[in-house]
Swiss-Prot record:
The record marks R162 as: Part of the EHPQR-motif. It comes from Aquifex aeolicus (strain VF5). It is found in: Cell inner membrane; Bacterial flagellum basal body. GO terms for biological process: bacterial-type flagellum-dependent cell motility; chemotaxis. Keywords: Bacterial flagellum, Cell inner membrane, Cell membrane, Chemotaxis, Flagellar rotation, Membrane. This is Flagellar motor switch protein FliG. It comes from the Bacteria. GO terms for molecular function: cytoskeletal motor activity. The keyword Cell cycle does not apply. SUPFAM superfamilies: FliG. Belongs to the FliG family. Gene3D superfamilies: 1.10.220.30, 1.20.5.2020. It holds the Pfam family FliG_N.
Amino acid sequence: MAQEKSALSKAQKAAVLLLSLPEEVSMNIVKELSEEELQKLFALAKDLESVPEEEIENIAEELLDEIKKAGIKIKKPEEFIENIKKVIPPTLAEKFRGILELGDAEKILKEIEKVDSRILASLLKNEHPQTIALFLSQLSPKKSAEIIQNLPEELKKEVVKRIATLENVNVQYVKELAQILLEEISSLGAKEALKLEGTAVAAELLNTLDKETRELILQSIGQEDPLLEERIREKMFTFEDIRKLSDRDIIEILKVVDKNTLMIALLGAPEDIKQKFLSNMSKRAAKLFLEDMEALGPVKKSEIEKAQRQVVNIIRKMIDEGKIEIGD
């Protein structure tokens, strides 16, 4: 259905659009108009009757059609920032530039996430541990954990320790390092810092590792810096921490956790943790659950640990959402 042409003149349409824009937008336009242009607009505006919403929409659509016909293209964000520097504070312009840099870094890091973790580990292993820590802190915990598992043993501990003590990350630096890595991989076939809580990043990363590797790294860190080890552990939630949950919390977990995943997870669990779940089921449900567990037969240790991590991830998500609370 064709839109109905407005009977207003182009100058009147300009006045209508200006008056219908949000104040902060219209004020920026007004700053760019000459005194003569403003006088004309206000003269037209005072004579305008109330304009229906539908007509305002039609006028806006007409303007878009005119823009398309004229072949006007949207400015690059960098050019736009240069233009608006005239009417916004310098600090705000710098903030916008930082956002652009962050966006560029995120695009490059998305490409890095697709690269085989073993290749990334082999490229990173000769970098300084601090450089590796900075880089891994900007990747997903899963990807970071995979890379760490492929690093030399002594380097693993050093990298996690440095992640835990990070406070600021320069976006531009991470972006440049990621770009270099991508270039090296290809050859094989916000000015503002991001604020980080290093211990939280390290804890999230360690939670994705298998229990043996996790404990080895934590113990190594503890030998050099017991306080740092304690701070990391405080941020973590492990399968053994289920003991700290109340019966009410266990009931909430049972509502959302996959039954088969829980069965496999409990195959390798201490008896008290197993009973923690069974005691919060009805007698009939607990009996059926145990029968189904026995019917599973032998399960690989790696599958049990994977199931335990899945249960932990659900619990951590519920803690973050405030649905359950971890006790002392």
